[in-house]
């Protein structure tokens, strides 16, 4: 596709190699995960609009079908950035010192917006969270930085 640079096409091909089966593409159920692996942040509604499914094995998305989806999602303006997430978490920062209660962050992730399940929150905290202090507070800016950093590729 003309508007996807060669390097990004290579990244997409790598994601397909990891997530899909040769010649068949990826399961449409995994569309959101594939886009997130490429540093995009699509909403569940956008994933569904782009052809994602709620059940496995309903349909496959081939590479040539995925590239226009990737390109369109990349142009989407409704993606949050670091500053947006920090502003949101400042609402929980009662002392205005860059910290919030871990329990409040956990509740927000489990119950608000496009909520996560318990296992997803546990994995997220294991990957991105500093230990809470004695009073249950965590520095939220470091959490957001780690959450939004580029994924680590192991050779």
Swiss-Prot record:
* Annotated InterPro entries: CALM/Myosin/TropC-like (IPR050230), EF-hand-dom_pair (IPR011992), EF_hand_dom (IPR002048)
Q: Where is the EF-hand domain?
A: 7-41, 80-115
Give the UniProt keywords, A-Z.
Motor protein, Muscle protein, Myosin, Repeat
Q: Which residues form a coiled coil?
A: none
Q: Which Gene Ontology terms describe the biological processes this protein takes part in?
A: mesoderm development
Q: Which PROSITE patterns match?
A: EF_HAND_2
Q: What Gene Ontology cellular component terms go with this record?
A: muscle myosin complex
Q: Name one GO molecular function term.
A: calcium ion binding
This one is known as Myosin light chain alkali
Give me the gene this protein comes from. Mlc1
Q: List the disulfide bonds.
A: none
How is this protein organized at the quaternary level?
A: Myosin is a hexamer of 2 heavy chains and 4 light chains.
Superkingdom of origin: Eukaryota
């Amino acid at each position: 596709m003309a508007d996807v640079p060669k390097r990004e096409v290579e990244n997409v091909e790598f994601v397909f190699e990891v997530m899909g089966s040769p010649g068949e593409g990826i399961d449409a159920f995994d569309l959101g995960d594939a886009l997130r692996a490429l540093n995009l942040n699509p909403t569940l509604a956008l994933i569904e609009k782009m052809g994602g499914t709620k059940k496995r094995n309903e349909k496959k998305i081939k590479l040539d079908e995925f590239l226009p989806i990737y390109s369109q999602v990349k142009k989407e303006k409704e993606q949050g950035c670091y500053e947006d997430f920090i502003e949101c978490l400042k609402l929980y920062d009662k002392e205005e010192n860059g910290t919030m209660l871990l329990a409040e962050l956990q509740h927000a992730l489990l119950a608000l917006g496009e909520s996560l399940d318990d296992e997803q929150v546990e994995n997220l905290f294991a990957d991105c969270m500093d230990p809470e202090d004695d009073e249950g507070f965590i520095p939220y800016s470091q959490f957001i930085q780690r959450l939004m950093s580029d994924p680590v590729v192991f050779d």
